[in-house]
Amino acid sequence: MGKSCVVTSSFSLLLLFLQTLKYVHAGFICYGDFFNVNYGVSRTYLFSSLPSNVVSNGGFYNASFGRDSKNNRVHVVALCRRGYEKQACKTCLEHVIEDTKSKCPRQKESFSWVTDEFDDVSCSLRYTNHSTLGKLELLPNTINPNPNSIDSKFNNMAMFSQEWIAMVNRTLEAASTAENSSVLKYYSATRTEFTQISDVYALMQCVPDLSPGNCKRCLRECVNDFQKQFWGRQGGGVSRPSCYFRWDLYPYYRAFDNVVRVPAPPPQASSTIIDYGRDEKSFQGSNIAIIVVPSVINLIIFVVLIFSWKRKQSHTIINDVFDSNNGQSMLRFDLRMIVTATNNFSLENKLGQGGFGSVYKGILPSGQEIAVKRLRKGSGQGGMEFKNEVLLLTRLQHRNLVKLLGFCNEKDEEILVYEFVPNSSLDHFIFDEEKRRVLTWDVRYTIIEGVARGLLYLHEDSQLRIIHRDLKASNILLDAEMNPKVADFGMARLFDMDETRGQTSRVVGTYGYMAPEYATYGQFSTKSDVYSFGVMLLEMISGKSNKKLEKEEEEEEEELPAFVWKRWIEGRFAEIIDPLAAPSNNISINEVMKLIHIGLLCVQEDISKRPSINSILFWLERHATITMPVPTPVAYLTRPSLSLGH
């Protein structure tokens, strides 16, 4: 019975694969499920301006369009070979777009890395229903070998193999060494003199959003693919979504016009790239022994070293596991590893600073990027915030909450290790006139919805009930796709599920985002988080900082909620809306007005009239006409005489 189920399942998967993988041809693959009309419209919209966008952005461009759904949102990545001519690049992309439309009329994903008809330029185009930005993508892959055999051209295949491997290694090292001055930073073209032939040409390129280590890995996979499957051919190309490799006995893409020839390399006894023979005819027996025996010895040494390194890393990186009272575990990191990862907490690695310490970027030995929060020594409440955040984030998992990877409490250090979020925090965008232009209404709406989902999880959907107590723009991190992640749970409070509010004698947080009942009396609830959400929402709509507004209009001591409320009731809506926000085909002016309405409902002085985060998310997700309560006056706050922490 078990075997029958396995066979049936395997056959079903095969049928599904044959159904979804509709087209494969020289450097071109269509795959995935069939898309709907909205997905097709989004794809057409992105394709319409893609060639010009690639050229105007230095040869590499990525974008996404559509509602935040795998069924509607399209992500596209495109690039040209470095050193391209602008018109040749545009023409190449225009051709591949037309091919994509005709050969992939209904499928959600496509990948191609092709050349124009004259072999003058290469370009790559990929679209998917998920973001690939910054991710190593090895599949699908295509291999296009030269149909002719190389055996007839070389008498000594062993010598050719050694020289070929040396050339490939040199090209690979150069391509995977990032040149930060160029958008197309991972690239190398080499022209090498061989003993038995005048020139051999090799070219490698990676998409520029990879790490150097991932670029190198991708290119090695391409080289190994060719060696395993088509060794003995007179050249060929291997392409993957993240990288491309080609070698030939003649120049191509006009990539070698200004490349200086490298003299024939000295013979090598071994290589870091494994060499595979195509068949017995390609090598004589003695030559096989020359190549294979050293390779096997090196492989054994390599495996032993890797095993030893892995054992060492398992003890070095994580030397303990922290168990919370509820049986949850959290990784404890070694201090020496964190010091190394952050370059001894150098200024170059510093990302920012908060009330309880500084945040640094780090890179683990595995290549994983991390964010390291180092709590300030002598900060008074640092120890409490440290323990609070570890205990809470150990038990919370949500796409809109920052992920805590582990901690370190070695010696007198208290350190938290998070996933690295590349686009920093929301305040770096919303309060900067240049960066704010990136925040189209589509992006702003996505961020607002994401923060609301994160709060809903904290307030209602997790096993706990948590009040954040310090929700603000600087505590909203943005990933590579500008999706928000709520961060900084050091001040959060844990409630039992039947509790609805609490009171504290130690008021902590950021003035301007605090609900009036919390700032004045220390009373907090889910509705105090809603108030903070409302202030942040109004900041995103207006592009104005609550603090900056106070300084600009100091005489009136008018905060942002009051500023928006007055103009709302007077009908002066244009003064509320950020003039730098780019228009959107998806978000109408009515949607923007709805956002203002929701923001004002959140910052009402009467706690009972503020909506729950569940209601807010319901309103945000309904794009038809909806009925919402009429907002009542907001809290008119003046700076209190009390000091925070009373």
From Swiss-Prot:
GO cellular component: membrane
Binding-site residues for ATP, renumbered to this chain: L351, G352, Q353, G354, G355, F356, G357, S358, V359, K373
InterPro entries: GNK2 (IPR002902), GNK2_sf (IPR038408), Kinase-like_dom_sf (IPR011009), Prot_kinase_dom (IPR000719), Protein_kinase_ATP_BS (IPR017441), Ser/Thr_kinase_AS (IPR008271)
Signal sequence annotation: 1-26
Main localization (coarse): membrane
Record keywords, A-Z: ATP-binding, Glycoprotein, Kinase, Membrane, Nucleotide-binding, Phosphoprotein, Receptor, Repeat, Serine/threonine-protein kinase, Signal, Transferase, Transmembrane, Transmembrane helix
Record-annotated active site: D470
EC number: 2.7.11.-
Post-translational modification Phosphothreonine, affected residues: T510
Gene Ontology MF: a single term: ATP binding
Regions of this protein lying in the Cytoplasmic compartment: 309-646
Gnk2-homologous domain ranges (all copies): 27-132, 142-252
The UniProt record lists the keyword Nucleotide-binding: yes
Modified residues (Phosphoserine): S474
Substrates-to-products reaction catalysed: L-seryl-[protein] + ATP = O-phospho-L-seryl-[protein] + ADP + H(+); L-threonyl-[protein] + ATP = O-phospho-L-threonyl-[protein] + ADP + H(+)
Top-level class of the enzyme under EC nomenclature: transferase
Family annotation (PANTHER family): CYSTEINE-RICH RECEPTOR-LIKE PROTEIN KINASE 37 (PTHR27002:SF528), RECEPTOR-LIKE SERINE/THREONINE-PROTEIN KINASE SD1-8 (PTHR27002)
Protein name per Swiss-Prot or TrEMBL: Cysteine-rich receptor-like protein kinase 37
Species per Swiss-Prot/TrEMBL record: Arabidopsis thaliana
